[in-house]
Amino acid sequence: MAVITIDGIKLDVPENKNVLDCALENGIYIPHLCHHKDLSPLGSCRMCVVEVEGQEGVTTSCTLKAKDGMVIKTKTAELERLRMLALELLLTGHPEDCSTCPKYGNCELQMLIQYIGPKTGRLKMRTKGFRPQEDNPLILHDMNR
């Protein structure tokens, strides 16, 4: 077992367990998108970035292994700035028609937008530019989605 501190809260956690799981299991929310309990952690969404005392820079909490004595911060101005930028970059390539999406109302991306609150409009949305194929009466093939 290892004793780690996340935002001033001491936790007894299994050594080498990823910090994101440790936090979530103890009621500490760290924003994340690409994490799934049945898959190996990637850190590709960059939402779960944290600062570790004694280490330079930031690291993704889903790939960070818990070590005894580790002190972790999840809420700093720099982390908020980095998360907002990562979310804005994700949204530049995301369709804006959420109300027609099957995940509408139960979408992790929408929840992150509400939690982080990006300043939309700073980055221009990339349009993919594909014309929907409507030659089949039953299937709409839209490569823009």
Predicted feature residues:
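Fe-S ferredoxin-like electron-transfer domains
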Residues: 46, 55-145
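Eukaryote-biased recognition of intrinsically disordered, low-complexity regulatory segments
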Residues: 1-9
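N-terminal cofactor/phosphate-binding cores enriched in small/glycine residues
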Residues: 11-68, 82
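Short polybasic/polar patches that bind polyanions
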Residues: 5, 24, 114
